[in-house]
């Protein structure tokens, strides 16, 4: 009976997390695009919309983890897939760093998508947005190397798996899409498509690798 009750509570928590994520994602994406369009002169081509969406997912993940880390009892144990608030407290430093990285990286990706869509009307030029993204990536890499030192064997293996899956997905898409474009069967990728492919593949790899190890199961 206790086991069944625990499973039911776990699935309720998962349903709540999915609902909150869906509402926040759809609402935030709509508001973000609307605000950008309100400036005038913004042409949201599919490539820009996709990259903006990928960046928004990173930012939303960072926001959720950040809120959960800041308030483990009030928010974290309900919003994040953890056993209890104590687990968050134990991992607070790494979770906080991951949260900050996701937030900043997501913002940089959205900025690049917006700057390309807005063109001359953008508050930040595409070149400036690109250099900002490179700086953010440098910081992201530095934080990742710092976190690697404190990872146990499980997290190190998970990180390697994520990298491998990301690379394989990118290679598969590049071969199929590039080959099809060369054969004039479809249009080739736009520059922003390549950026979206890289970070979108990493997002997918995170979920796949975590799911394979049972880390996505309700807790």
Task: Identify what each model region corresponds to.
Residues 38-45, 179-195:
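Extracellular/periplasmic helix-loop-helix junctions in multi-pass membrane proteins
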Residues 8-52, 98, 110-111:
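Long, highly hydrophobic alpha-helical transmembrane signal-anchor segments
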Residues 1-15, 69-88, 219:
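N-terminal juxtamembrane cytosolic/stromal segments of multi-pass membrane proteins
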Residues 44-64, 120-137, 195-197:
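Alpha-helical transmembrane segments
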Residues 85-105:
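Membrane-water interface at loop-to-transmembrane-helix junctions
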Residues 59-79, 141-147:
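Membrane-water interface of transmembrane alpha-helices
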Residues 150-168:
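Membrane-helix boundary/juxtamembrane motif in polytopic membrane proteins
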Residues 27-34, 169-185:
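Hydrophobic alpha-helical transmembrane segments in multi-pass integral membrane proteins
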């Amino acid at each position: 009976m206790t086991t069944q009750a625990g499973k039911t509570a776990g699935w309720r928590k998962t349903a709540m997390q999915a609902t909150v994520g869906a509402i926040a994602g759809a609402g935030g994406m709509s508001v973000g695009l609307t605000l950008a369009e309100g400036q005038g002169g913004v042409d949201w081509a599919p490539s820009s919309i996709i990259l903006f969406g990928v960046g928004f997912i990173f930012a939303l993940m960072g926001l959720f983890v950040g809120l959960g880390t800041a308030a483990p009892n009030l928010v974290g144990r309900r919003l994040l897939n953890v056993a209890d608030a104590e687990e968050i407290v134990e991992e607070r430093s790494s979770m906080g760093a991951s949260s900050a990285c996701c937030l900043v990286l997501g913002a940089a990706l959205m900025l690049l998508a917006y700057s390309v869509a807005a063109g001359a009307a953008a508050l930040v030029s595409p070149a400036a947005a690109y250099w900002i993204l490179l700086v953010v990536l440098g910081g992201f890499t530095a934080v990742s190397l710092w976190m690697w030192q404190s990872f146990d064997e499980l997290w190190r293996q998970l990180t390697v798996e994520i990298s491998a899956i990301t690379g394989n997905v990118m290679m598969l898409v590049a071969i199929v899409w590039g080959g099809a474009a060369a054969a004039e069967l479809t249009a080739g990728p736009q520059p922003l498509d390549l950026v979206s492919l890289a970070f979108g593949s990493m997002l997918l790899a995170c979920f796949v690798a975590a799911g394979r190890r049972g880390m996505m199961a309700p807790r």
